[in-house]
């Protein structure tokens, strides 16, 4: 296993043998939404029975059904900030959602973690989460795409225009898969 930079007490495994040998109590799946369930299916045969599996996916579609039949305890969360605009030194202005349908101890772990980071925590069902994401992520992303598509270069832009353009550039620089998943 290789130690990860900037992350304490975290190891990166490159083979399933390393996972089996380590016997994790909690696995956090942080792949893109498209690969969340396949990644779980690949690693689960190598996990102890009592291991809690966890995702931090921005879209929860299909996960509730998967979790109900997977045979593992689970916890599902969504840090509501990303690499484009979040200030990792000032997370007290950011939010996280914890799905209230998962394992109690898993939820306590993430509540503690997110509290230590200073995040505002909200608890929603899978369905409530996806409605919130549709409203708070999808609509702003789509409106930003429309803004970027119809705007032309301004020699003397106003403050609001400059801020909108900065946001548009940031959103358009996101990973294509992330944008596809959110939309």
Model-predicted regions and their roles:
Residues 44-49, 90-91:
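Short, conserved loop/helix-junction motifs that constitute active-site signature segments
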Residues 28-29, 54, 98:
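Redox-cofactor binding/interface segments in oxidoreductases and associated redox assembly factors
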Residues 11-17, 122-125:
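Short acidic-hydrophobic, aromatic-tinged amphipathic segments that line or gate anion-handling sites
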Residues 59, 63-124:
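Rossmann-fold dinucleotide-binding core
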Residues 123-183:
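An accessory alpha-helical subdomain
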Residues 47-63:
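ADP-ribose/adenylate-binding Rossmann-like module
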Residues 1-6, 12:
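NAD(P)-binding Rossmann-fold cofactor-contacting core
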């Amino acid at each position: 296993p290789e130690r990860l930079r900037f992350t304490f007490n975290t190891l990166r495994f490159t083979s399933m043998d390393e996972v089996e040998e380590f016997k994790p109590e909690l696995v956090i799946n942080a792949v893109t939404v498209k690969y969340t369930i396949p990644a779980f299916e690949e690693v689960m045969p190598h996990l102890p029975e009592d291991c809690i599996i966890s995702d931090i996916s921005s879209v929860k579609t299909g996960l509730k059904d998967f979790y109900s039949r997977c045979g593992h305890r689970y916890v599902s969360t969504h840090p509501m900030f990303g690499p484009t605009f979040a200030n990792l030194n000032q997370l007290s202005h950011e939010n996280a959602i914890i799905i209230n349908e998962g394992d109690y101890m898993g939820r306590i772990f993430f509540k503690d973690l997110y509290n230590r980071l200073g995040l505002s925590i909200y608890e929603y069902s899978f369905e409530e989460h996806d409605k919130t994401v549709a409203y708070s992520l999808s609509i702003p992303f789509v409106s930003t795409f429309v803004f970027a598509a119809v705007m032309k270069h301004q020699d003397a832009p106003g403050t609001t225009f400059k801020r909108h353009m900065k946001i548009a550039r940031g959103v358009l620089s996101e990973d294509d898969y992330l944008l596809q998943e959110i939309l």
